[in-house]
Amino acid sequence: FLVAPRRARAEDFTECFFDIAVEGQPLGRIVVAVDEGTLSGRRFVELARGVGGLSYRRTTVDNIEVSGDGDDAVEIYLKNNGVEKFVTPGSDASVDVVGGPSAERLLPDLGKRSHDERGLVSLIVRRDPSEPEPEPKARLVSVRGKFETVYDPPPPPPNGTGFTITLRAAPELDATNVVVGRVVSGDEVLEEISQLPTVKDNTSSPFFAVAKSIGDKRALVAEQAFRKPFRKVQFMKCGVVAKSAPASEDEAPQ
């Protein structure tokens, strides 16, 4: 499903599975056919399979993004934030992942496939270039009885492990995400997740805008929860579907 300059071959595709649970109750399985002919695709497959104890297992659907407001709102994609650090969980041991510890080597894959339909899976590899770069946040702290201004570093850029699954065409993702595959089984599971109630997005509230402009941490925490499902949606298991052995000439149908 990738386009020129390179045509994906059938043997390049690997199927990855994700077993979904809502509040610990099994919901169903999603299977994604991934093009391993790209660096981004190989990275996604490795994280689905697991490397050095690091994988998408136990990560969550963190947001259900929508377009429009109120009764006109429509769900456009599910978002997973990926893994925070390239280390074995519970330790400081670094893990080597295909593509390295950042998204830099994945950037050349941008634009090879548009987010023009439902069921496309893509890695988040950079911030939206149309938005301003985040700046360090100033805050006052008391040092030996005096107030001093300190600056918290801005959030890091995407590390190329978070991903989205489209629920309809989402061309706004073309500037930030690299398509690595498509859902080939479990569309009904996607639909059930998309209908879950989420935390209301209050970015249009003047009170929120003021709080964010002055660096109020409560506003920053609240913003991270916008469009988050009220119920925990988790990838309980994930991995790679074993490929069937090709039929021999004697076994081939006549």
Predicted regions and their residues:
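Cyclophilin-like peptidyl-prolyl cis-trans isomerases
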Residues: 2-254
